[in-house]
């Protein structure tokens, strides 16, 4: 894409897109996704010796800080003999606090020198590739070149010969010190004028060509977008025409010079009326590469303008490559870290397939994940961008734009949103989707792989799945997630979420707070996890797990299994034949209709069988068991339990009633036919409702029977009954 002009100018990025302007799919091919490990943070200063307490594993990132120019940080890592590894250190993009020129040293187990690198990575960052000769502990020694700098850095370790950068490190590669439109980096607030150039040849004497109407429209659209997403403001001079009286000017020329377009970086120091030279920020399009007619989003030409405006905003290429006539640059030979592709930044030369994204997507529709992070580092974020309740995808708030998946059938984008209660709507898709509402995570949208992300700092609250087997991950906000049709897997994450699986057999996990979950149609698995959750199974046979917290579980239709987990839970089986398990806590179990199994668990539980022939098992604790209608079997199962009966209770069995335990009782207070001990055991000439039948006692209540297994009539007394 880009080349530095032959008479080097540090403010110029001249871009040659011809190497990428080939039929889609001609890139390296669908590459594998790279593994990302843990991110470790230096809290106390790392020792500059083998006594360091910091250690990282392969695929981890270590985020450190050189507190002074002379500071050195050592980090241990275990390597395997014969395996090739690449180590990299880069600044983190925090311009006033980032180490701009880190130096990397690799040391053996005793601290002896193995190798060093300075500037082997992008820009002035460092990278080493090494094949371990012995298995064991090695040390990565991070310092600044010639003890000349301090500040934050990121350190990575991966297998193979290409480094891996996390977002902070990658944003650092896009930024250059003192190349921004603001005097105070990160605060924004400046207004920069721009215009469509009226006249004037290129700096190297190429004949000026006015922008076509389509080029003007695309430029205006992208500049309005750039104005909206950052703390920097742009004002067009003479919006309906042209002008040469603006800080940033857009012009065109036509020449086969190997450059598809080029742009100048912002200035570095104040001076003159605006503080910048005449060239800084200017953009030139080469009409031999950039279309004058077809500049819709996703096209090469639209993307070219987006890329050049990135330079005009202060973004550099992520690697040390600059194309021109006769120069061949490939991902295999030129990319210095794995994430240097269009999947992460519009400033890359390389197709997104190199980092694992599906082919056939075209070019990025928006700034991408690392671009947003870098731009917001320079100018601050824009909290008013799309600040209403915005829908992205189908039924989009902004119809006909890149955010409308009816119009944009091959989305390759990152979404930044300032405020409001927002939704990603995938309801128009029939294939499986993976959508993460977490910032900085790649999603698989529209049948493609890794083509969608949510920018850092953006919060999207809600999601609507499609008709395929979707996987949707929530975030820490209070999410509302609708799975739609298909066998979906939905994870709520943090926040008090509302999740509805919709049709088919879904798996739903509420996450860390109190959630409201609906299974809908299909045999669903619903897990509340942490928090006080309310869960409705819906139709068909569901598995409902409350997890921790005081949960309310409703099986509704179908042969359901409900497990309360820890906490004081309420379980209602609903219709059909259900199994309810209270586990820990003082639980309430309601079987509802059907032949149900209720098992109380460890504490003092209330079990109500409801209609049907139920089995109630109390477990440990002082439980209350009421079989309800139907022929029920009740087991107190340890301690002193109470068995409750009312009219029309059916023919019930108590398997483990202990007549000798004065704290275990049969409660007839809701039974109209037996009102006293005499009614049960008889007195004088009275007829007893209870009789000995073999080893058991059978009590005839008039509307049913109660069989006390292995109980002697003579052992029953007033302490065994409540009237």
Q: Locations of the language-model features?
A:
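Acidic, Ser/Thr/Pro-rich low-complexity intrinsically disordered segments
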Residues: 61-152
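Acidic Ser/Thr-enriched surface turn/capping motif at secondary-structure junctions
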Residues: 3-7, 14-73, 111-126, 148-150, ...
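Acidic, glycine-rich calcium-binding repeat modules characteristic of RTX/beta-roll
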Residues: 92-94, 207, 292-305, 323-334, ...
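Pan-zinc metallopeptidase signature
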Residues: 77, 364, 370-467, 473
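Metzincin-family zinc-dependent endopeptidase catalytic domain
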Residues: 137, 160-187, 214-342, 349-358, ...
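Acidic glycine-/aspartate-rich tracts in secreted/extracellular proteins
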Residues: 91-94, 110-111, 145-148, 199-201, ...
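Disordered inhibitory propeptide/activation segment of secreted metzincin zinc metalloprotease zymogens
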Residues: 2-39, 158-211, 262, 273
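Low-complexity acidic/polar repeat-biased segments
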Residues: 139, 156, 450-452, 457, ...
């Amino acid at each position: 894409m880009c080349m530095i002009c032959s008479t080097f100018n540090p403010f110029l990025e001249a871009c040659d897109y011809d190497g990428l302007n080939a039929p889609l799919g001609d890139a390296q091919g669908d590459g594998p996704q790279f593994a990302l490990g843990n991110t470790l943070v230096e809290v106390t200063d790392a020792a500059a010796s083998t006594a360091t307490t910091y250690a990282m594993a392969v695929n981890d990132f270590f985020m450190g800080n050189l507190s002074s120019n002379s500071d050195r940080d050592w980090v241990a890592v275990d390597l395997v003999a014969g395996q090739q590894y690449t180590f990299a250190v880069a600044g983190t993009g925090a311009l006033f606090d980032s180490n701009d020129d880190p130096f990397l040293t690799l040391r053996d187990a005793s601290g002896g020198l193995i190798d060093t690198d300075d500037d082997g990575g992008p820009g002035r960052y460092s990278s080493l590739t090494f094949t371990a000769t012995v298995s064991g502990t090695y040390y990565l020694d991070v310092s600044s070149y010639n003890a000349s700098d301090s500040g934050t850095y990121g350190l990575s370790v991966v297998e193979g010969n290409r480094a891996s950068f996390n977002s902070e490190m990658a944003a650092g590669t896009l930024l250059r010190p003192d190349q921004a439109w603001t005097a105070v980096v990160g605060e924004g607030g400046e207004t920069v004028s721009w215009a469509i150039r009226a006249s004037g040849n290129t700096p190297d004497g190429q004949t000026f060509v006015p922008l076509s109407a389509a080029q003007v429209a695309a430029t205006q659209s992208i500049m309005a977008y750039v104005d909206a997403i950052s703390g920097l403001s742009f004002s067009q001079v003479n919006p309906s025409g042209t002008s040469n009286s603006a800080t940033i000017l857009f012009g065109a020329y036509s020449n086969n010079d190997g450059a598809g377009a080029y742009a100048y970086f912002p200035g570095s120091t104040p001076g003159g009326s605006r503080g910048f030279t005449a060239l800084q920020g200017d953009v030139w399009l080469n009409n031999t590469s950039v279309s004058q007619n077809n500049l819709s989003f996703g096209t090469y030409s639209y993307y070219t303008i987006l890329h050049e405006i990135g330079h005009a905003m202060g973004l550099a290429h992520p690697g040390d490559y600059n194309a021109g006539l006769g120069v061949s640059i490939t991902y295999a030979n030129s990319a210095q870290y794995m994430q240097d592709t269009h999947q992460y930044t519009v400033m890359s030369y390389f197709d997104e397939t190199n980092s694992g994204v599906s082919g056939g997507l075209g070019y990025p529709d928006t700034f991408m994940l690392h671009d947003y992070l870098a731009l917001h580092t320079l100018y601050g974020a824009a909290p008013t961008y799309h600040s209403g309740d915005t829908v992205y995808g189908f039924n989009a708030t902004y119809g006909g734009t890149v955010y409308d998946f009816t119009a944009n059938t091959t989305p390759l984008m990152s979404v930044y949103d300032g405020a409001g209660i927002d939704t990603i709507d995938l309801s128009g898709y029939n294939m499986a989707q993976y959508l993460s509402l977490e910032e900085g995570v790649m999603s698989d949208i529209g049948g493609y792989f890794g083509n969608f992300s949510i920018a850092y700092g953006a919060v999207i609250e809600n999601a609507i799945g499609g008709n395929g087997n979707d996987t949707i991950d929530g975030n820490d906000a209070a999410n509302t997630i609708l799975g739609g049709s298909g066998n979906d897997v939905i994870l709520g994450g943090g926040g008090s979420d509302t999740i509805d699986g919709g049709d088919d057999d879904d798996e739903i996990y509420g996450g860390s707070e109190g959630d409201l979950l609906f299974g809908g149609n299909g045999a669903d698995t619903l897990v509340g996890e942490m928090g006080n959750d309310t869960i409705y199974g819906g139709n068909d046979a569901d598995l409902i797990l409350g997890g921790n917290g005081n949960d309310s579980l409703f099986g509704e239709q179908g042969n359901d299994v409900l497990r309360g987990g820890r906490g004081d839970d309420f379980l209602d089986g609903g219709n059909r034949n259900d199994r309810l398990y209270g586990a820990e806590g003082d639980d309430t179990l309601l079987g509802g209709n059907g032949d149900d199994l209720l098992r109380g668990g460890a504490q003092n539980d209330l079990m109500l069988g409801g209609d049907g022939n139920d089995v109630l098992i109390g477990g440990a604790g002082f439980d209350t068991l009421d079989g309800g209608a139907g022929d029920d079997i009740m087991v107190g199962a340890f301690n002193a339990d109470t068995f409750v009966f009312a009219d029309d209770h059916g023919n019930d069995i108590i398997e483990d009633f202990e007549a000798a335990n004065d704290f275990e009782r049969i409660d007839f207070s809701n039974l109209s036919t037996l009102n006293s001990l005499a009614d049960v055991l008889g007195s004088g000439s009275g007829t007893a409702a209870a009789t000995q039948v073999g080893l058991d006692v059978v009590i005839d209540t008039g509307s049913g029977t109660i069989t006390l297994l292995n109980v002697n009539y003579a052992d029953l007394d007033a302490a065994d009954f409540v009237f």
